[in-house]
Amino acid sequence: MELQQDLIPQKKTIGALDHAVFLCMVFCFWFSGYIYVPVFSLYLEDLHFSYGAIGIILGSYGVTQILLRFPLGLLSDILFSLRKQLLIAGFGFSVLSSLLFLMFDSFFFVLAARLFAGITASTWVMATILYAHYFNNGNASKAMGIMQFFTVMPQFASIVFCGLAAAHLGRQVPFWMALAASAAGLVICCFIQDPSAPPANRGTIRVNQYIKDTLRLPKLKLFTILSMTAHAVLFITVFGFTPLYMNQLGMGDAELLWVMSAFFLPHAAATLSFVFLRFTSRIAYSVMLISFAVTGVCLLYVPFLAALFTVCITHACIGLALGFVFPLLLSHVVEISSARLKMSVMGFYQSFYALGIFLGPLLAGKIAQLIGLAGVFYGAGSLAFAAFFVMLAQKRNMIN
C-alpha cells in the first residue's frame, strides 16, 4: 500500500493568539472527558453495577485507544491534512458520548458512551504533535510540559466543579457540563492553526515501511512499558477505585473533593515545573526512579488508612510523583522520533500505554470483586514497583 506524503513541511508563523486558541481547545478536550470521572465509579455503583461490571466500563475507555491511537498517528503522518479534521471528529464523539450518558443508564449504552469517550481520547495524538510543531525542535520538554499542565489543569478544574455539582445538584449534572464543554471545544478546534501544513512537493512512502521505522526506534518500547504501567496505576486508583474506597470508609462527595485536590495540586505543580526546568538524562532517570518508588510505597499504605488527612497526604505524594513521570516519558518519546515519524511514534506510544488504561481497571475490578478494595491498591502498588525494577535493570540504556 502506498500513500502520498509531504516531504518538507512548511511551518506557518505561530503567534500568542494561536497558542491561546490551541490551549483553550486542550482545556475543553480534557474538561469534557474528565468532568464526570471523579464520581463516575460512584454513579455506576448507584446504577447497581457489580465491581466486575464497573471495572469493564472503566477499562473500556482504553479499548478504543488501543485500537485507534497508532493507526491514527500513522495515518496523520502520511496525510497531513487530516490532523485537524480528526481532532474535530474527536470532539464530535465526545458530544455523542455525553448524550448517551444523559439519555440512557443501561450497561450497554453506558459502555458504548465510555467507548466513544475513548475514541475522543484517541485523537489526542493529533493535539500532542500539532502543539510540538508550535515550538523549535530543542524545546520538546517545554512543549510537552505545557501540554501536560493543560492536561492536568482542566482535570483538576473538572474535579472541583464535579465535586460541587454532584454534592449539590446530583451525579448526573457533570454529564451536562461535559456536553457543553464538548460543544465549545468543537467550535474552538475549527480555529486552531496547523503549522505543519503540506507543501506542493509530495512523494510516496509505503505504510509498512513507516511501521518498521517506528518499531526500530531505540528506547520506544521501554518508555511505552513504563508509561503503560503509570497509566494503569492512575486509572486503577484516582480515576477508578479511590472514590469507591472512600465511600467504603463512609466519606462523601465533599471529602472526595479534598482527596482529588490533594492529588492534582502537586500533580499540576510537578508538570508545570517542566516549563521552567531542563532535565539531563541522568537527572530525569533519577526523578522517575524515585517517583515510581514513592508511588509504590504510598499505594501499599492506602488500605491501612481511615482518616481523611492521611488519605490526602498519600494521594498528594502519588500525584507529585506521577506529575514528574508522565511529562518526562512524553518528552523522551518526542526527542527520540524524527520529524517524519513524530505522529506514528506518538500514536504507538499512546496506543500501547492505553493498554494500562484498559487492563488496569479491568483486572482491578476482578480483584475488588474477589478480595475487596484493599487488593486493588496492593495490585497498583506492585505495578509501581515493577516499573521501578524495570528502570533499575535498564539504567544504562535509559541514561545513554
From Swiss-Prot:
This entry carries the following GO cellular component terms, namely: plasma membrane
Q: Which GO terms describe its molecular function?
A: transmembrane transporter activity
InterPro entries, per database record: MFS (IPR011701), MFS_dom (IPR020846), MFS_trans_sf (IPR036259), MFS_Vesicular_Transporter (IPR050930), Tet-R_TetA/multi-R_MdtG-like (IPR001958)
Q: What is its main location?
A: membrane
List the source organism. Answer: Bacillus subtilis (strain 168)
Q: Which SUPFAM superfamilies match?
A: MFS general substrate transporter
- Tell me the protein's name: Uncharacterized MFS-type transporter YxlH
Compartment list: Cell membrane
Q: Which UniProt keywords apply?
A: Cell membrane, Membrane, Transmembrane, Transmembrane helix, Transport
The organism's lineage is:
Bacteria, Bacillati, Bacillota, Bacilli, Bacillales
CDD domains per the UniProt record, alphabetical: MFS_YxlH_like
Could you tell me the gene encoding this protein? yxlH
Please report the record's description of how this protein sits within the membrane. Answer: Multi-pass membrane protein
